[in-house]
Amino acid sequence: MANVKLFDQTGKEVSSVELNDAIFGIEPNESVVFDVVISQRASLRQGTHAVKNRSAVSGGGRKPWRQKGTGRARQGSIRSPQWRGGGVVFGPTPRSYGYKLPQKVRRLALKSVYSAKVAEDKFVAVEGLSFAAPKTAEFAKVLSALSIDTKVLVLVEEGNEFAALSARNLPNVTVATAATASVLDIVNADKLLVTKEAISTIEEVLA
């Protein structure tokens, strides 16, 4: 099993923590990670685009001129697609771009990105993140003590609201729970800051 250093909130190394190789030590599957990232990015699209077809455009209920005898081309409505101000043919309609991948694929992608962060030495384990009250300055001190000055994803245990509230005003800091962190969140972060309890949760979820 891989060992990573365990720090406290002051940046002092207190011990080490063993990571499950089946989750944090596999060979990253880049193809699977790519598929899951594309899927999750697609799910973020709003899909609210819409245009009016000839039935939705106002007006055009009356035939503009009689069928025969005018010398002009026959027309049934001034809202036909060939008319200025007419309806759009085959335009975009509201839709969901999201699609689901098999659970095994999603789990393999999570294991792959966690393993990649550990292998690249971008996985920082901390004993805990406890705050008496939501204080942005206190959270900034923790990051400074741990020498984290890049885009970071902080993974905490469920119910640690003060950590999330303390970090929400800090640029380049995202807080998520260990059970809900997505592959896209992890890929977008330069470093992971993970509490000891969150590591246990990750191993329970992905075991």
Swiss-Prot record:
Q: Give the CC-aspect GO terms.
A: ribonucleoprotein complex; ribosome
Tell me if Isomerase is a UniProt keyword of this record. Answer: no
Q: Which SUPFAM superfamilies match?
A: Ribosomal protein L4
What are the GO BP annotations of this UniProt entry?
Answer: response to antibiotic; translation
Q: Which key words are in the record?
A: Antibiotic resistance, Ribonucleoprotein, Ribosomal protein
Disordered: annotated span: 49-78
GO molecular function annotation: rRNA binding; structural constituent of ribosome
As given in the record, the signal peptide range reads none
Q: What does this protein do?
A: One of the primary rRNA binding proteins, this protein initially binds near the 5'-end of the 23S rRNA. It is important during the early stages of 50S assembly. It makes multiple contacts with different domains of the 23S rRNA in the assembled 50S subunit and ribosome.
Which family does the entry's similarity section mention?
Answer: Belongs to the universal ribosomal protein uL4 family.
| Description of how the protein assembles with itself and partners | Part of the 50S ribosomal subunit.
Provide the protein name. Large ribosomal subunit protein uL4
